[in-house]
Amino acid sequence: MLTEALVAVRQGTQTPAAQTTCAPSTMSSSSRPPLETLQAQSVSADETPGSALPACAQPCETARSATPTGGETPNRSRYLSHRGNSIRQQQGILQEGFLLYSLDKFHETDKPDGIINLGTSENKLCHDLLHERLTRPDMLLLDPPLLQYPDWSGHQFLREEVAKFLTDYCCSPKPLKAENVVVMNGCASLFSCIASVICDPKDAILISTPFYGAITEHLGLYSDVKLYHIHLDCEASGEDGRLFHLTVDKLEEGLRRAEHEGFIVRGLVLMNPHNPLADIYTPKEMVGFLEFAKRNELHTIVDEVYMLSVFDESVTFDSVLSLESVPDPQRTHVMWGLGKDFAMAGIRVGTLYSESRDLVEAVAKLGAFHGIPGTTQRQVAQLLQDREWIDTQYLPRNRSRLKAARSYVTGELRGLDVPYLDRSAAMFVWADLRKFLAEPSFEEEMRLWRHFLKHKVVLSCGQAFSCSTPGWFRIVFSDQDRRLKLGMKRIKEALEEYKDQITVTDCYSIKDGGPRVRASGKDSDNAAIVGSTLPQGKSSDMLEEKDHTVQAGLGADELVLRDCQPSKPAEGLDSLIGTLRHQIRSSDWLEKNTPELSAGEDPEILDVFKALLERARK
């Protein structure tokens, strides 16, 4: 199989005009997640576990998986175990950008030309409010018991305050019990611990894409649990015309595929409000998801870390804990923390509520590795019981500031004619920058992401969230006014410069519901979207000209897709090289595929192999 790929590369190098063709797959190269998800121990709903480099007879498969990584993989260490090397080599696709940011952070006076971070979901709008509250005398108490070992599930006084707080702010129909609460140093630790006790190594948990990419590491690094991706389309679906719409039918299909491919599926992850979409699921939707999990005896991990960051009074968030009856309470586990809603990402506090005594006891056993200092627990308890400050000072001002910041960013995006999901929760906007890509590929998305870095602003691109379609970016707006405005100015400059570098020479649009017409150059700005960029099986007649209502039930709160996209590029040498690069950087690929082995299969391709090896390592 390796030989076939290398022969194809050699032939492609000799005759670049000759391209292998194949019938269209159900998902194009622009609608597939990057292979980093496999490196990060995630599994796509359309990929077979353990699959190797695709053969030449499957060029569509090859191209749709090829995408560059965010940084170089360290060499294997003889001082570490196989697992240790795997952990050491684990890298997020955006690691290079955030490493550069850490070395070149913006500062108003010391480094005004430094990098501005609009990629990390942190609330930086309420430091003044928190400083005033956290420096009051009641926060400075030091009782002797705080200096001793606590209950590993958290001090009793904190678990009691958490239970009361969640009862009130989640509108629980009955008082929640402190004995069902576990407190750890962040929800990342809770994710890892829950996965450890409900799954065995190599088991899988369902999750819809796009999703907060760090969950891959949360579940995989310690527990070796896989994420099985259920890809959601960026096109309108369902009666309400929602984009990236999760349904029970899609969950059923994802579970069926996972089991057909041999995975043991143990659970489901739900985020509400969602990251990065900022969607809020209705109680009816949540009950449907939970009933699906119950039918299939799956645990449901519900992440509600943005539940208090809903800043539109007309929008209602309903916690799972507000339900009169949870379909399967023994397998439903709700997480919340202070990092997002209370703008305390550095004060690592995550809470778990579950009625499963078995799970609570098992997770608490792992608390010895994930505990919170006693003094911090006391401060958090004091904060949570100060309802007057929370209700009259913090929450109203935080929501007002979030709303104003979001309004500014979305106004700037509209000025750039950039579509986005119109939501009123969390602290980021999911923006559609597909029209700025020279071609609909994850390689091009990464080039645009690096172009933002060049302009000293770091964002998070869609492939970091395993988005199935390239060109989507998450823009965090919960930052101080000066940094936010300067960051958006840099984004605007980067996009204008990048767009000037792209010449759209041939694309199609649909005007007035009529037949396809040619569009090129500046004229394409009046077009809706290219039919060729729509996912396979989607009809291009769903979309009309910009500034007009979109057909097929697209709601008024949804984005309108605009402008012309270039057609999908032909499969070629770069796609194969991209795939080889991913395989080479995996943990044991080099051990299994050496130049000598390839020479044994076909001595003539040894030089080709070595040349590709050098290119892939660059």
Curated annotation (Swiss-Prot):
Modification N6-(pyridoxal phosphate)lysine occurs at: K340
Positions annotated to bind substrate: E122
Positions with biased composition (Polar residues): 27-45
Biased composition (Low complexity): 11-26
Record region (Disordered): 11-54
Matches recorded under InterPro entries: Aminotransferase_I/II_large (IPR004839), Ethylene_sulfur-biosynth (IPR050478), NHTrfase_class1_PyrdxlP-BS (IPR004838), PyrdxlP-dep_Trfase (IPR015424), PyrdxlP-dep_Trfase_major (IPR015421), PyrdxlP-dep_Trfase_small (IPR015422)
Keywords, comma-separated and alphabetical: Pyridoxal phosphate
Recorded family membership: Belongs to the class-I pyridoxal-phosphate-dependent aminotransferase family.
A GO biological-process term: biosynthetic process
Annotated source species: Takifugu rubripes (Japanese pufferfish)
Protein name: 1-aminocyclopropane-1-carboxylate synthase-like protein 1
MF term (GO), any: transaminase activity
